[in-house]
Swiss-Prot record:
Keywords: Ribonucleoprotein, Ribosomal protein. It comes from the Bacteria. One of its GO terms (cellular component) is ribosome. Belongs to the bacterial ribosomal protein bL28 family. GO terms for molecular function: structural constituent of ribosome. One of its GO terms (biological process) is translation. It comes from Hydrogenobaculum sp. (strain Y04AAS1). This is Large ribosomal subunit protein bL28. The lineage of its organism: Bacteria, Pseudomonadati, Aquificota, Aquificia, Aquificales. HAMAP family: Ribosomal_bL28.
Length: 63
């Protein structure tokens, strides 16, 4: 599965619990977006970044 380029966040597995306490497997997926970023050496690269890292300004988008 895909992971965030910055924080390496990826899908995790858990259970969904119904009102009658039945448990079903499910997947919690991060909100990954494909963005073109500027690398430290000045080049650009298209990577998958989670929205939490985008909002925090941990990457510089290439325009």
């Amino acid at each position: 599965m895909a992971a965030c380029f910055v924080c390496n966040k990826k899908a995790v597995y858990g259970k969904s619990v119904t009102f009658s306490a039945e448990r079903n497997s499910r997947v919690f997926k991060p909100n990954l977006q494909s963005v073109k970023i500027r690398m430290p050496d000045g080049s650009t690269k298209r990577v998958m970044v989670c929205t939490k890292c985008l909002k925090a300004g941990k990457v510089v988008k290439a325009v």
